[in-house]
Each structure stands twice: as C-alpha cells, then as structure tokens.
C-alpha cells in the first residue's frame, strides 16, 4: 500500500479511535521507517497542522472522511519538515486518495497542498496566533504545564516537540563502556558517554538496533538516561529480596540484575502476559543470571493473588502514568490523554503504594517513579501517602540535572537531553 495512505489510516486511528501508535506500528511491518517518520511527525505537529487544514478548507470534512483530513496533514508535514522533493510529496499524497477509495478527494488534496506551498510563510504565521498552534499541544495540557511549572513550561513544550536521542545502557556485566565506545567507533557510529551515569552512552544519530555491535549478544540495552537512575537509587545490596512492580518490558528489571547480580530474589510482576514475556526475552538476550528471578503474571495491587508472605528489602514501583514526560518519544500522547485521566492515575498510584507498602520490610526502601511531569501523579501522590502513614520518611534522591522538590526529584524533558521523570525514595522506619 502507498505509504501516505497507510500513514493516514494509522494517524486517523490514533485521532478517532484513540489507538496507541506503538501498537499500530508494531502490527505494520512494511516500509516501517518512512511510515514511522510520517506518523510520528504528523502527530508531533498535529495541533499546528490541523489549524492550517481547517483554515484552507471551505467547510469541515465529514466524519467518515477524517482519513482524508489526516492525509492532508501528512502532506503538510512532509512539505514543511522533510527534505523530500515537492513533486514527490504532492504526487504520492494525492495518489493515496485513490488507495483510500476516495478518488473524489484527489483534486481537493492537490489544491490544498499547492496552496500550502504558495502560502507557507503566511500560514505558519497564522498558527502562531493561538497557543495550541504555536506550541503544537492541546490547550488543556498547556494550561496544566503552565500552572505546574511557571518557570519551565515553555522549555517543556519545546522539548516535547524535539526528536529524542537514542541512549544506550551498556551491560557492564559483559563489557566496559570504554570498550563498547570503541566498538561503536569501529562501526562509524558516533557516540559519547554520559558522565553522570556509569553505563550510559548517547548516540549522535539514532540507528537500527541491528547496526549496534554486539546487540544480539547482550552488550547493550536501549534506555533513556532518565530511567537509568532507578537501579542506583534503590541502594541494592547482596542477598536482598527485591520487587519490581509493573515491571514490563524489563528495562529496570534487567538493570537491577546488572547492578547487583547477587540478590537473593528478584520478583518482577506485570499484568500483561505478552509484556511479561518481553522481560524474559530481554534478560535472556542480555545474558543475565536468572536463577533468582521470578516473573509473575498478576495485578500487583492484589497482594493475596501473588504474595507468598515474604517481605521485600527493596521495592521499585514504576507506576502506570500519563507518560507526559516522554511525549517526544510518543507524540500520540498529545491526543490519547484527556484532562480527566490525571485524577484516575492519581488514585491508582495511591492504591498501588498502599498495597505495596504492606510487603516492604521495616528498614526497607520503596522507590516510586513515573515518566510524568504532572504534580498530581507525582508530588501530590507522595504528599497524600505521607499524610496517612506514620512509619515512613523521605530519603534523599540525587539525580543529575533534576529539580529537587519537597517530596522527590523531577527531571523535566530536555534537561541534559533526558526524558521527563520523577523519583521519590521512601524509607520504612522499624
């Protein structure tokens, strides 16, 4: 199928049906690279491109023709952001209407694309008149961010629209970072170490995992720098029992095993069987010791469904969240999240914290983390939890480049070119 037609279908499913772009792309294997570029770019700039399309259309398209609307946005994205010959963009985008079985739209698409080419500067200036168009985010989210981060809101929105870096975590149980950097250099892959993390490497340009030396042999794992702090903040010691709640796909589970291979037990829990299998696949590829690893399919908040009664020395709760700290990696979040979602995430996190606190040993640590930048999912959750529990105290969390808050540390998107992430370390008093 024409890549522009496929893109229009996928973008339309995100906009109309609130489908995850990651899930849609995983089911579509043909022309993956270009389709991914077109989908990500169109969704990244959706709220800007949408204003242009609405201005140029004499009347709104019918709901059943929203795929054509998305196709037009895809054309605008290519014309403004990609280095593809103009005639190729116009011909391919117009031709996609035929494949979508809507040949009547070919003339309309051709007209709008050519108007965009002729009036581009004027149209882009027009989008700057509204804050949604200027920053390419939904209004409700901009308002939330301005309220939460009055000194940082603009830099957050700008970072959300940037292309994210590709960051690796070197598997130090197999190879040193210095030697792996040499291997990358031999493959002409430009990279630099991130000095604030022992195993992190950032590539100058993203590449396919198949180009990474030793990837299949487990020499590295793809993980943003913001998430690589978790295993160190846990203060792991030999012979401890550790729980990784909400563990899939295993980024932090595997890192825990790399940082300390001599744990007594590591229990990784997730409620999705397919995602749980990915934990096992990732740890197998990395060649990590698994004799003390237990992967359990369960709702971690329902303690009686999975617990043997054993208490844990360390618990990592990387809680399900709005993922508003990783919009640059998942631009569909701008369309998938709604204002009412945030209070639901808040309550779910409190439920998880309360449940997991009961299986933490006295003298143990629970690390709470999210990839959100919204206080309702972060500081306000910890504040409410502390107000209802006596034998708990905050432990210092030192994260390079993070903002120290009353109840934890917040990394904002773009700081040191990291994703947005929140950490709060809780100590259970004896």
Swiss-Prot record:
- Which GO molecular function annotations are given, in alphabetical order? RNA binding; rRNA (cytosine-C5-)-methyltransferase activity
Record field: catalytic activity: cytidine(967) in 16S rRNA + S-adenosyl-L-methionine = 5-methylcytidine(967) in 16S rRNA + S-adenosyl-L-homocysteine + H(+)
Which compartments does it reside in? Cytoplasm
Locate the residues binding S-adenosyl-L-methionine: 246-252, 270, 299, 318
List keywords of the entry alphabetically: Cytoplasm, Methyltransferase, Ribosome biogenesis, RNA-binding, rRNA processing, S-adenosyl-L-methionine, Transferase
An annotated GO cellular component of this protein is: cytosol
Q: Which residues form the active site?
A: 371 (nucleophile)
Q: Which stretches are transmembrane?
A: none
Gene3D superfamilies associated with the record? Helix hairpin bin, NusB-like, Sun protein, domain 3, Vaccinia Virus protein VP39
Please tell me which top-level EC class this enzyme sits in.
Answer: transferase
Q: Which GO terms describe its biological process?
A: regulation of DNA-templated transcription; rRNA base methylation
* A Pfam family hit: NusB
**EC numbers, comma separated:** 2.1.1.176
Q: Which InterPro entries match?
A: MeTrfase_RsmB-F_NOP2_cat, MeTrfase_RsmB-F_NOP2_dom, NusB-like_sf, NusB_RsmB_TIM44, RCMT, rRNA_ssu_MeTfrase_B, RsmB-like_ferredoxin, RsmB-like_N
PANTHER family, per this entry?
NOL1_NOP2_SUN FAMILY PROTEIN _ ANTITERMINATION NUSB DOMAIN-CONTAINING PROTEIN (PTHR22807:SF61), NOP2 YEAST -RELATED NOL1/NOP2/FMU SUN DOMAIN-CONTAINING (PTHR22807)
Q: What does this protein do?
A: Specifically methylates the cytosine at position 967 (m5C967) of 16S rRNA.
Family indicated by similarity: Belongs to the class I-like SAM-binding methyltransferase superfamily. RsmB/NOP family.
Q: What is this protein called?
A: Probable ribosomal RNA small subunit methyltransferase B
The primary gene name is rsmB
